């Protein structure tokens, strides 16, 4: 949708300068407990057992690292990192918006709406970081991946929606990437599950969607 036309490019007039608003549509990912396996020796009637470690050592497990904290074996946080949705192509978004914008001089992520529903997790999930990277990126640790923002923590079993906190540096890097000619990007999410003795054995999952609103500034064909 064409939003404005004016001298937004340092002297350019309405004949060749336009501002358009684009939306990526919902990009979806799952936060699940499937990767968190609790060894039998750490289970006690549906909860994380309190296993003493008087010598400062905890049982060795292949599935869940443990640390001796205050004399009790405490599971270390388990990181969860997943892809978010599909590759987003800004050229396609421009075409679908039926704009006449052909040369992009800057973009700005103005809003990222999120929704977490349904949420069947029986444990709280801390803040969820959302990242963007080139379409060739295989994960968060790949070159050219930047943090785009943070979704607030999700309480167990609670559906949530709202606006993600946007990282200004990550948004600026996304603008440089798109202006540089690579219009295809993908997204990733990262959070963790941190369990304490006495917590329930983790189960369930949450479906989370993010939808970016982007302001694109550019020019029409000259």
What are these regions (language model features)?
Residues 115-126, 195-199:
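Extended, low-complexity, turn-rich repeat/linker tracts enriched in Gly/Pro/Ser/Thr and Asp/Glu
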Residues 103-120:
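A short beta-strand element within beta-rich, extracytoplasmic domains
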Residues 209-222:
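Short, low-complexity, Pro/Ser/Thr/Gly-rich segments in the mature regions of secreted, periplasmic
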Residues 14-75:
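N-terminal leader/pro-regions and domain N-caps
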Residues 5, 12-14:
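N-terminal Sec signal peptide cleavage junction
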